[in-house]
Amino acid sequence: NLGSAYCVRDYVVAAELGGPAALAQARAELNARGLRLVLDFVPNHVAIDHPWALQHPEYFIRGSYEDLARAPNDFVDVKGEVFAHGRDPYFPPWGDVIQVNAFNAGLRAAAIDTVTTIAAQCDGMRCDMAMLLLNDIFERTWSARAGRRPTTEYWQDLIPAVKAKHPDVLFIAEAYWDLEYELMQNGFDYCYDKRLYDRLVHDNAESVRAHLTAGLDYQDRLVRFIENHDEPRAAATFPGQKEYAAAVVVASAPGAKLIYDGQIEGRKVKLPVFLARRPPEPPDDELAAFYRSLLNTIHADLFHVGEWHLCDRHGWPDNASFHNIVAWTWRLGAERTLVVVNLSDFRSQARVRLPWDDLRDHTWRLVETLNWECYVRDGDELSEQGLFVELDPWRYHFLKFE
């Protein structure tokens, strides 16, 4: 048992793991391979034995011995000071941590120093439960215990101060409750897209498509995923071909992509982050091969700096199954790709409207990027009627136009 990854006393690599020098070497090795290192910052709470508890009790939400007697699971006595355990407003407190007071000016200054130190050791930071520090959320959670509400937001104070010394470091918000845009306005470069995940799990294709109608200035800064440390394993949540379809959506939509440890080989057992062991699970070789092909494909510049377009699609008076289909294109110079996904349990058909005005008077080869099947289509028909597609449940096209 590793203990809690959120119960942080100090942001320094343990000596038995090599200390800061080992982290610096690991970062250099990653950078040499074209990778960047992202570290975690937990802003909402710290370990009960954090030095601030004794040196700066004013940095925390405090209580009384009456509070402790009344709600012993909500408060803790730390050498004569009663502090609130960390929490979010919808769940019981976390018993291994104490709650910082995000409204306290001293705490904000100390957090800036802490994050500046972290930023010197990495290329980006994932900020745990970042929305809990927003003034509205914090005030609603802690009310009078928090004291006077500041005129500025926590992240508006912290992020610019850190970037003044480390301008290239990325800030990534773990975000819930549809607060992604507000966190972006507070300075975050990227935010988790939990809403798309929920739509893929629970909703239909029209819901997913509606989500993707947002402006690209917003979508480009979302982190798309179908699995992370909090959610159940994708292989357990998206049975059979549904995972393939969901993965194609997440990988080929605008924005950053998060692939979680064990997702590629199809692990199904969700593990607490406190454990350093896991049960043996046979790898899903077919799924792993699919992910390797998909990730190699989306590594191309086309899917990062190309022009993305959400496609219209239509059906026929006696066939409305086009509602089960989502489609979009990417274009960069002469390169162009169409992605079509059937997000349903039903065989579905549609005509997909393409955004390109130079299709006429050409014959086009449509090559399946992920399996190299090839189709030949007339450009006049593509321009006038759109591309006819017919897909089995949870199947997709990933078509390169030549």
Write out the residue ranges for each language-model feature.
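Active-site and adjacent substrate-binding regions of carbohydrate-active enzymes
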Residues: N1-E402
